[in-house]
Structures are given as structure tokens and as C-alpha cells.
């Protein structure tokens, strides 16, 4: 049975539109599970920041470990020493975005002065960005704006954070509205207009050693 020409054209256009939308949606999502990266090296496009004394901001490298959330590898920050305000930052080139849905899993490994880690987004550079982080020593989650290397606390949320367990930080930022979830539990919902666009990245502090896995970025239209 032959379809009427108009109906056939409509079906073709509809299918094409659906495929185009699917392709755009897939293109707007980027995943890093670090399993295809050479162990002992930094993934391509990942750029380590600089500490105030000029040294690299951490020892970031891909690590093969049986503790990976999605085996066999993680991205690890392994520098287990640092002064109190040593922010270990790695940014990812080619991730400039404004509205986004961003998440990562992290595993606290060790640290006496500090533990845990965080997500960076809308970063101008390694000294200006938004940050949300979880700290098992303080048993809290916080969100900051970091301006010229100085943290400015936006909100705090007290939360039990178990050691030796993977956790997830999840950020959704549309316009000025920022929502943060910890293990998919909502913890922050606020508006801040300091930064409008920028790179994403990962963060630890002081002597915290942390593994990261399954980093996911979706750019929202």
C-alpha cells in the first residue's frame, strides 16, 4: 500500500527531527570514566592548576585500582600533604558551559587535616569558580564561590559522610539558580550571579587523598 505523498513526507521529516534531537542530546553529554586512559598519566584536556607557591596543584593521575566505582580505573589526587589552604585543582579544557547538569562520584581515601573532594564549574581559571565539596572529617557539604583564590561560603549543610564508600555530588545550574544533591539527596537550592560561564573541574584540599570516577557533564539548552 502506497502512502499519500504528504503523509510520507511528514513521516520522513518527523523521523529526521527525532534523530536530530537525539543526536544533539547525545552530543551535549560527556562522560569520563578514565578506563581508556593510560595509568600514571593525566587524561588529555585535563590541566592541573597552580598553588600559591608556584607548585602544581596536586598529583593528579589515572590509577588502576580494585576500588574503582566503574572498574578498572579512577582519576586520583595522590598528594597527601599540603598547607591548610592548598587547593588541589584540575580543570578540563573544552568544557566551557553556562547551564549544566554535572556530577561525579568520589571516594575519600585518607587525610588528617582534610578529606573528601568537590566539583568545580563555571571556572574562569584555577582561582575563580563555583565549588561544592563534601568533607567526611567535618561531616558537612558546602558550596562556595572562589574569587581570586579565596573561598566565600554560600551555604553549609551538615551531613553524615561515611568513609570507605563511594558518594556522588550532583550540580544543576540554570541561570543564577544552583541546585546541589549529595547521593541524590537535595542539599542546596540558591541563586548566585558571580559566574555565568566557564570550565568544569575537580577539587581537593590540603592533605586529602581522593579517588574520582564517572564524571558526567550535560550542557543544558
Which role fits each region the language model picked out?
Residues 147-168:
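Short, aromatic/His-centered strand-loop micro-motif at the edge of beta-sheets
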Residues 34, 102-104, 164-180:
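Short tryptophan-centered beta-strand motifs in secreted/extracellular beta-sheet-rich domains
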Residues 8-20:
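Bacterial N-terminal signal peptides
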Residues 39, 72, 77-142, 147:
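Secretory/extracellular carbohydrate-interaction modules
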Residues 158, 181-201:
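Short, solvent-exposed beta-strand-to-loop segments that form ligand-recognition rims
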Residues 87-94, 155-161, 202:
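Beta-strand-rich interaction surfaces with strong enrichment in secreted/lumenal proteins
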Residues 41-76:
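Extracellular glycan-recognition surfaces and repeat-rich motifs
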Residues 28-33, 195-221:
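Ligand-recognition surfaces built from glycine- and aromatic
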Amino acid at each position: 500500500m502506497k502512502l499519500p505523498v504528504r503523509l510520507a513526507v511528514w513521516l520522513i521529516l518527523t523521523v529526521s527531527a527525532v534523530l536530530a534531537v537525539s543526536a544533539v542530546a547525545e552530543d551535549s553529554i560527556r562522560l569520563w570514566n578514565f578506563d581508556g586512559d593510560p595509568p600514571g598519566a593525566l587524561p588529555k584536556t585535563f590541566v592541573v592548576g597552580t598553588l600559591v607557591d608556584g607548585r602544581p596543584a596536586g598529583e593528579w593521575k589515572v590509577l588502576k585500582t580494585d576500588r574503582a566505582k566503574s572498574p578498572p580505573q579512577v582519576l586520583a589526587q595522590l598528594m597527601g600533604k599540603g598547607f591548610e589552604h592548598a587547593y588541589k585543582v584540575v580543570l578540563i579544557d573544552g568544557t566551557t558551559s553556562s547551564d549544566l547538569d554535572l556530577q561525579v562520584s568520589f571516594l575519600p581515601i585518607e587525610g588528617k587535616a582534610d578529606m573528601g573532594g568537590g566539583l568545580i564549574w563555571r571556572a574562569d581559571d584555577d582561582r575563580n569558580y563555583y565549588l561544592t565539596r563534601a568533607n567526611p572529617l567535618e561531616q558537612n557539604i558546602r558550596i562556595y564561590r572562589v574569587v581570586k583564590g579565596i573561598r566565600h561560603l554560600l551555604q553549609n549543610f551538615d551531613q553524615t559522610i561515611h568513609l570507605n564508600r563511594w558518594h556522588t555530588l550532583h550540580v544543576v545550574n540554570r541561570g543564577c539558580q544552583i541546585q546541589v544533591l549529595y547521593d541524590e539527596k537535595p542539599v542546596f537550592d540558591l541563586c548566585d550571579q558571580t559566574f555565568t560561564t566557564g570550565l568544569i573541574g575537580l577539587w581537593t584540599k590540603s592533605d586529602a587523598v581522593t579517588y574520582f570516577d564517572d564524571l558526567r557533564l550535560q550542557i543544558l539548552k
